[in-house]
Regions:
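Acetyl-CoA-dependent GNAT
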Residues: 11-91, 97-102, 106
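Structural preference for long, well-ordered alpha-helical segments within the folded cores
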Residues: 102, 126-127
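Conserved active-site tyrosine of GNAT-family acetyltransferases
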Residues: 128, 133
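Conserved GNAT acetyl-CoA-binding A-motif
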Residues: 100, 106-119
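Conserved beta-strand-loop-alpha-helix junction that forms the acyl-donor binding cleft
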Residues: 115-125, 141-147
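Terminal substrate-recognition subdomain of acyl/acetyltransferases
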Residues: 2, 141, 145-158
Length: 158
């Protein structure tokens, strides 16, 4: 059983973007969604998006252990988690959960937080449900034919 790893999450430095794009382009769901390296770079630098990386709290070593891409007004004017990725060697250490906690704190003044999960990504769907996100809709054939993007939502205030 892997142990929980404490990380430091901070805004990405300019040299982190290439690493994050390579991580995206070399892993699912982006492989199945036919996203190449250039499309991943473009996603990470989209105007209005904020990229944050996690580094080991003990050593702050390079490269990062993963990233989260946030869009403050990305879904119907509400905050949106655009992407979360954790390097294969760091998966199962609680880093994804720390990214969600970070995003929720970052957007705490808002009532809602949204994200999309690919229909084939069962592991991510379970992960988000465990963290209190609810399935609220489906976009059929949204990115690639044959797969849907599932809309998940978390409400912070009543």
């Amino acid at each position: 059983m892997k142990m929980h790893r404490a990380v430091h999450i901070a805004a990405a430095a300019s040299d982190d973007y290439a690493w994050c794009a390579r991580l995206m382009a070399s892993s699912d769901p982006w492989i199945t969604l036919c996203r190449d390296l250039e499309e991943c770079r473009s996603t990470l630098t989209r105007p209005g998006s904020e990229l944050f990386v996690a580094r080991d709290q003990e050593s702050e070593k390079i490269p990062p252990l993963g990233f989260i891409l946030l869009a403050p007004y990305g879904f119907a004017g509400s905050p949106y988690i655009a992407s979360v990725a954790v390097a294969a060697e760091a998966q199962g250490l609680g880093i994804g959960s720390q990214f969600l906690d970070f995003a929720e704190q970052h957007f705490r003044s808002h009532a809602h937080l949204f994200l999309l999960v690919s229909s084939f990504n069962q592991r991510a769907q379970q992960f988000y449900r465990r963290h209190g996100y609810e399935f609220v809709g489906e976009l059929n054939d949204y990115i690639v034919c044959g797969h849907s993007e599932l809309i998940f939502h978390k409400r912070f205030h009543d």
